[in-house]
Amino acid sequence: VTTNPATRPFWVVVGSGIDVRGIDVLGQIFDFSGIEKSEKSIKKTWQEFRDALSKGDFSFDDIASAKKNTFLRVYDDLFNKNAGIEYNTVLISEIEKYCVGRGTILGEDENPDFERFIPKTEFIKEDNRFSPSGVEWLYLAIGKEAAIHECAQAECRVKQNDRFGFCHFQFAADSTALKVVDLTIADEMTYKALNDGLETYGQEQVKKSIKKSKVLGFILRNNVNVEEFKKLFTKWGVYTYSKLLSEQIFEPLDEKDNKSLMYAPFQTMAQYYISLGYAGIIYGSTVSKTGKNIVLFDKTTAHPVGAIEDYRIL
């Protein structure tokens, strides 16, 4: 970023992977030429983050040490220190309108009850995306009715003729004020749409500056509302970063992949969100095009309701 230090966007300058250039003497012309470079940079710093965890430079729950790593340091600067995470924050009360549920492949002789859908340490033998083996966090599909069934089936890797059980959940009455991080806020947006909003602001400021310059008889060199610019730029950065993360990091794993290694940085991010007072994470499914998931750090935040659905996969 080349701009007056007073208006320089704090977090973009070093290592973020988001490259915005070309603020001119009027302070408002943007060039969004770095998305491809940003994708590579974010993916690179994420891999370095994973490598540091695999080498034992810090453990997944040592957030103070993890923040010294480039990826989380930059992320924390944007999302925490500069309040960008506000754009990712939703309350449980805001997502109660969506259907939530959990599915499982049933044995032929099983007679499932609600307990079958509650996570229990002794049955969690492998790492999940945001939690190590043995950790009783509640993973649910969230969205419209048809979508959560499709997502749950995909997450369970069902095969034709499998017996499948599905149970709806409901958020606890005392959970409505809890906040969760929504990592999917930009999934439906294009980079062009994101960039257009910031560029439109820049063009409007140029017009205002030219108009004022004509009246005053000289060019205004610092005609930016710093707080307004900071807020707008932070929002753009959060949405762009979220989209890049979603596209470049949330990738499906193969059976041969080491889950403990591949999921370690996600598990660190979960601990980071916990340190900021969050109760869960909404994230996109890597195996279902229509589905989203939510992981709740306290499994009592939601409870089973209604009749258990029991059917064959066709």
Region annotations inferred by a language model:
Residues 1-131, 154, 158-314:
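Active-site and NAD+-binding cores of ADP-ribose-processing enzymes
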Residues 141-145, 263:
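Conserved structured core elements
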Residues 132-141:
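A short, exposed loop/beta-hairpin motif centered on an aromatic-Gly-Thr core
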Residues 144-158:
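Short active-site loop/helix that positions an aromatic residue
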